[in-house]
């Protein structure tokens, strides 16, 4: 197939641009579990695009909804005006999210959703007369998008180091990565719940009267798939309740079925005060995100506001009509095909298959929870990430798209994946691992 255009103008995100142009990995179509490369090769998608295409690619239900909406109402401002589908989608999201989290603020991405949660937390405390509660607490190795709020509370050094001074008044508690104790764990690891107590050290230093919120990914994804230790999130909730600190779950990856439930909050039985979500809310077809907040937060903002506008925050495309239509169609698919429950069942098969690779000479750890898994390969001396990157490129040429972060190969297949799809994914991965030096 003829190259569609030259590759010089587009600056690709989170990509080794110079290397990509030497050996491009271009897709031109997608359907179901597969992409189609520009050379006509079928590429099995083991990453749901980028953790987002939960119902599989090219769903006619969603493309039809988008087309019909674009032909009816292409855009409507969300500042001081509304349209029905944004209200309908908000209600549908609230219905499947944890009880009590029933108000939805729409954004355009996970990064915007996270920054919105932080601003809402600060505004909430100010509205109830506790304006000194301004400190934000993140976690080492945490990923919360690429907005200045998100990289400030995030704990991935490469995402922070080039951008100078970030938000002030931010602290980070310890990560939960304990390979010496939890290597090759299946599901939530046994060791590490005590690490939630490092939050108490920060509270002792700054006093709870100065701390607004704590944000955490229930399952850390971009840092290499780190499921939380057993009881860790429950302990985090208890500490936040004790000190009147808001707990935020960043569910941009885990929201909408990734763990076999609508949310990780439901899966773990721990309800935060705010959830950020995005990606699968529209099946990845149209950019959209949301901050889903508790009734207590919303009611406080409504009751205590001293101006007609209760929250001076929003985006031009918040609740966009076409994105709302896509979201409603995606939620219909998740419900009608029972995809959340299907993912929970497939997760057990995935766990069994991925751990069969533990004896490969290059594999130093395997982690999994729900329909998410990671294989960590040993780094090359003096070249951290090189072996993982090579694995990603080899997999592509063998017909597999996978996500790589450092030397960790991450897997999050669409929720429609059947057992034979899982088999094929890891047959290719096994072949790739054998070729790594």
What role is predicted for each listed range?
Residues 1-437:
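Conserved N-terminal phosphate-binding loop of PLP-dependent enzymes in the Aspartate aminotransferase
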